[in-house]
């Protein structure tokens, strides 16, 4: 059993990439929790962008999906172009949901823009991680 498993993680993140990913996932989740009035709602953010918390669900969901799955994919050795295709599919799904699917949904281009922004932020982060934050896993 000297040969490594082809299903293992081919790369391991540097400490800054791992902590940064957890921090950014936590921030996206806190933004999501701010939808309801309470401790997680930022008055400064509401003053800067008055309708922010009515659209933040799309941003948070898109960010959490792509950054969560994409980070694991990069550690598994999936090429960044495949992560880019997933980001494009997620952006297109945001557009399709907000413009074409009217069942249980009202058309809202601002929601689509927030979803695309969350996807773009996640892909930018993942591109940086792939470029600067991964090193080969010595166990494989």
Segment roles from a protein language model:
Residues 1-140:
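Bulky hydrophobic segments
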